A protein has these predicted regions:
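Intrinsically disordered, low-complexity regulatory regions of eukaryotic regulatory proteins
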Residues: 17, 30, 44-48, 64-67
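A short, exposed loop/beta-hairpin motif centered on an aromatic-Gly-Thr core
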Residues: 35-52
Length: 77
């Protein structure tokens, strides 16, 4: 699975932090909505197209916060 994009709501701390990830594996697209940082709770969404996944990302990023896109690390070899 390859991570394509990562957004963060600009808040620090386990309670306030939220992240949204866009990933792809083959023809399947995945969106992860995570609350609480690395050890937080995640909800996963699976889609057959990038556009459908991005629709969900846009809806999630409409929630309150100073959302910003974070750079994605290149895949390790």
């Amino acid at each position: 699975m390859e991570q394509r994009k990562h957004w963060w709501n600009g808040k620090w701390g386990r309670i306030a932090r939220k992240d949204v990830y866009l990933r792809v594996s083959g023809d399947q697209w995945y969106v992860e909505q995570r609350a609480g940082g690395a050890e937080g709770v995640s909800h996963f969404f699976e889609y057959d197209s990038e556009e459908a996944a991005l629709d969900t990302v846009r809806a999630l990023l409409a929630s309150p916060g100073d959302w910003r896109e974070l750079s994605v690390r290149p895949p390790s070899r």
